[in-house]
Amino acid sequence: MAKKITGYIRLQIKAGEANPSPPVGPALGQHGVNIREFCESFNTATKNIEKGLPTPVIITVYADRTFSFITKTPPASILLKKFVLKGKSGSARPNTEKVGKATRQQLEEIAKMKTPDLTAADLEAAIRTIAGTARSMGIDVEGVE
């Protein structure tokens, strides 16, 4: 028989940097989850992701206070800031003020990383999705309609 689920916790934690301090500790403590055990397993699971990138995680908490979790890829806006804007933030007025240029190759690279979490049917649709996010951040997009 399957374990009874008592709740889900959605957090965004920096890859490889989970620790018991807020927001992780209080969120898990409310559900009676072993915080140290979660932090160790999360840091192990995210060792392939660049350290410090915010990584969404969905934690499933069971009635016997055990847990399982699924890590997602970092948000597209974070990846665009990292690869295209080199750490700068997006534009406050994206339609009038452009803060950078993204090539099709950069968008394709980000789309390949995000493919498991996107609902896009193929790579081309994923590229268009990432291009839309880039435009909304004030980034000029080249090579994508």
Curated annotation (Swiss-Prot):
<dbReference type="GO" id="GO:0006412">
    <property type="term" value="P:translation"/>
</dbReference>
<keyword id="KW-0687">Ribonucleoprotein</keyword>
<comment type="similarity">
    <text>Belongs to the universal ribosomal protein uL11 family.</text>
</comment>
<dbReference type="InterPro" id="IPR020784">
    <property type="entry name" value="Ribosomal_uL11_N"/>
</dbReference>
<protein>
    <recommendedName>
        <fullName>Large ribosomal subunit protein uL11</fullName>
    </recommendedName>
</protein>
<dbReference type="InterPro" id="IPR020785">
    <property type="entry name" value="Ribosomal_uL11_CS"/>
</dbReference>
<comment type="function">
    <text>Forms part of the ribosomal stalk which helps the ribosome interact with GTP-bound translation factors.</text>
</comment>
<keyword id="KW-0699">rRNA-binding</keyword>
<dbReference type="InterPro" id="IPR020783">
    <property type="entry name" value="Ribosomal_uL11_C"/>
</dbReference>
<dbReference type="Pfam" id="PF03946">
    <property type="entry name" value="Ribosomal_L11_N"/>
</dbReference>
<dbReference type="Pfam" id="PF00298">
    <property type="entry name" value="Ribosomal_L11"/>
</dbReference>
<keyword id="KW-0488">Methylation</keyword>
<dbReference type="GO" id="GO:0070180">
    <property type="term" value="F:large ribosomal subunit rRNA binding"/>
</dbReference>
<dbReference type="InterPro" id="IPR036769">
    <property type="entry name" value="Ribosomal_uL11_C_sf"/>
</dbReference>
<comment type="subunit">
    <text>Part of the ribosomal stalk of the 50S ribosomal subunit. Interacts with L10 and the large rRNA to form the base of the stalk. L10 forms an elongated spine to which L12 dimers bind in a sequential fashion forming a multimeric L10(L12)X complex.</text>
</comment>
<dbReference type="InterPro" id="IPR006519">
    <property type="entry name" value="Ribosomal_uL11_bac-typ"/>
</dbReference>
<keyword id="KW-0694">RNA-binding</keyword>
<dbReference type="InterPro" id="IPR000911">
    <property type="entry name" value="Ribosomal_uL11"/>
</dbReference>
<dbReference type="GO" id="GO:0003735">
    <property type="term" value="F:structural constituent of ribosome"/>
</dbReference>
<dbReference type="InterPro" id="IPR036796">
    <property type="entry name" value="Ribosomal_uL11_N_sf"/>
</dbReference>
<dbReference type="GO" id="GO:0022625">
    <property type="term" value="C:cytosolic large ribosomal subunit"/>
</dbReference>
<keyword id="KW-0689">Ribosomal protein</keyword>
